[in-house]
Amino acid sequence: MRNRVKQLRKEAGLRQEDLANLLGVTRQTIIAIENDKYDPTLELAMKLSALLKLHVDEIFYLDQDKEKL
């Protein structure tokens, strides 16, 4: 799964630490998500979606090269 978290965070004027605090996670978690090293839980994805006022599928999407449907 890929994501646009880094781009959207910057557009919102947030630092990684700010976003982490707002979501109740560590900065390291945000770094891992932004670098596609960690897929967030559904709960965390929903919190991020609500915070950014976007649908989850506007933030996260399948990497079609890796995920054959």
What function would you assign to each model-found segment?
Residues N3-L22:
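Short basic helix-loop element that most often maps to the first helix and adjoining turn
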Residues E17, Q28, D57:
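Key DNA-contact positions within bacterial/archaeal DNA-binding proteins
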Residues V25-Y38:
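Recognition helix of helix-turn-helix/homeodomain-like DNA-binding domains
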Residues N35, L54, Q64:
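Short, conserved catalytic or interaction motifs in soluble domains
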Residues K37-K47, K66:
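Short, basic-rich loop-to-helix N-cap that marks the start of a DNA-contacting helix
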Residues E43-E58:
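DNA major-groove recognition helix of helix-turn-helix/homeodomain DNA-binding modules
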Residues F60-L69:
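Short, charged recognition helix plus adjacent turn
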